[in-house]
Amino acid sequence: MKQLHPQFGFNTLAVHAGSAPDPATGARSFPIYQTTSYVFDDADHAASLFNLQAPGFIYSRLTNPTVAALEEKLATLEGGRGGTVTSSGQAAETLALFPLMAPGMEVIVANKLYGGTINLMGKSYQKFGWNAIFVDSENPEAFRQAVTKKTRAIFIESLANPGGVVMDIESIAKVANEAGVPLVVDNTMATPFLCQPMEWGADLVVHSTTKFLSGQGNAVGGVVIDSGKFTWLENSKFPSLSTPSPEYNGLTFAETFGDLAFTMYSHAISLRDLGCSQSPMNAWITLNGIETLPLRVERHCSNGLTVAKYLEKHPSVEWVSHAGLESSPYYKLGKKYMPDGTGSVFTFGVKGGYESGLKMLESVELFSHVANIGDTRSLILHPASTTHRQLTEEQRIAAGSGPEVIRLSIGIECAEDIIADLDQALKSLG
């Protein structure tokens, strides 16, 4: 693809980055390359590809033209050097840590996270010998105090799911920098339209592309984006990137590929061995979804804040956690990191606790009761009985998912219709 003007705005890049006309046919909509493999020119060409000496495509578990277009688009929008698209957001988190971790090593993790991530890091990673150290999300000093010689990464969400907690990315990035480890930020809830964590010091950014990026609840996927700024050769903590790789005749990724080292490793080894590749069809759906991302997110944010203000005044509601409300303890951080809006996913507490929460779900009509977020449709969930069900009560409360909590993902419908549906459901609680 020809080089885009560096001064193009976000909306322009969302449409054009990574999406050149098809060179074979001239088709303007980027094609779906639904293939497993690619014909080599000759034996030397095949050898150069397998030796990582030439760019190109080998097998769609590693690389695919449609997937590569999505990687370029997402890396551009996040201000990164390269990207690796995966089969899901959970896979992206694992791929982000895979080159960094080893048995016995630690990752410091914010305690306010998506429930699936807490399970993944707190339980499943133990089978790899990786140890997750959970700390208070709202206290950067807690991250500093948790650093040890075994620390290999710090992981946070820019805007925590489900509670809408805005993380102090800049302060935590300083802790990671002092410790000599990468800061990994999950930017799913904010999207690069609202927040670009790399501007605040993040080294790696992950997304569940399933959510706002694809935008219509029809394509599962994830991505890891590398800033290209972390200096892997400065210490011995990351031998996967800084020492010779026997699989590739002693090639050292950091020396050979420089600021693309992490991305090249992710394709050549992580995807090769873990196999968590995204299908070309899902990549194509997401490519098309991103073209309207700015328009959708503006409406999501506008509707979300309108609904939050309505709920804040409702007699059946105990509290509302939305960083766009002036009453929110995260209001100032929201203005700093997400000046154009703090998203449309937030929580509120219904009076009556667990049972009222379940009744609320059964009383809505416009809302869909699903586990997804970031859809054009308005969605509702009771985290304590679903996404955070496997956690202990203490973990649920720490993550902002107590028994009374309802999570909303506000869609792009008419705000007055969304409010009317919530109003009739709240009235049914008595």
Where are these regions (language model features)?
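PLP-dependent enzyme catalytic core of the Aspartate aminotransferase-like
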Residues: 2, 81, 104, 122-123, ...
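Conserved PLP-enzyme active-site core in the AAT-like
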Residues: 2-5, 14-16, 20-23, 83-314
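N-terminal "arm"/small-domain region of PLP-dependent enzymes with the aminotransferase-like
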Residues: 2-64, 72
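Glycine-rich beta-alpha junction loops
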Residues: 19-21, 34-40, 211, 228-229, ...
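Conserved N-terminal alpha-helix of the aminotransferase class I/II PLP-enzyme fold
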Residues: 42-94, 116-123
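Short amphipathic alpha-helical segments
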Residues: 55, 81, 220, 282, ...
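Conserved C-terminal alpha-helix-loop-beta "cap" of PLP-dependent enzymes
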Residues: 297, 305, 311-312, 316-406, ...
